[in-house]
Amino acid sequence: MLGELSTGEIENLLTSNVIGRIGCYADKKMFVVPITYVHDGEFVLGHTIEGLKIKILRENPECCFEVDVMENLSNWRSVIAWGTFEELKGDEAAKAQDKLIQTLGPLMPSET
């Protein structure tokens, strides 16, 4: 698809996917890595463990987020958003984690 997505198409793309890529920059290096996420209508919420991504985002919280859907080589859509990384604590973190579990839980492999 060539052109710009409408606001509704952007919202649909963000809410109908669970894997995107976060891009960040520190020490003259770009870092782009896939993450699982939930879009709550306003924010992109993700969860990760301590590592290079968190280290970089703490040093420079300005980041971008990208999600795409590719149906074939001539039919694909993508959204790129720019924003600021924020670590959630306490009740905010618990609410975000609940949203992640509600959305991602059914996608987890079963042991049965």
Predicted regions, residues:
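Short, surface-exposed beta-strand-loop junctions and turns on beta-sheet-rich folds
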Residues: 52-54, 72
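Short beta-strand segments
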Residues: 17-49, 65
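Charged, gly/pro-rich active-site loop segments
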Residues: 73-112
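Structural motif corresponding to alpha-helix initiation and N-cap regions
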Residues: 7, 50-51
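Short, basic/aromatic recognition patches
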Residues: 1-21
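Active-site-adjacent structural patch at catalytic or cofactor/ligand-binding sites
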Residues: 49, 59-68, 75-86
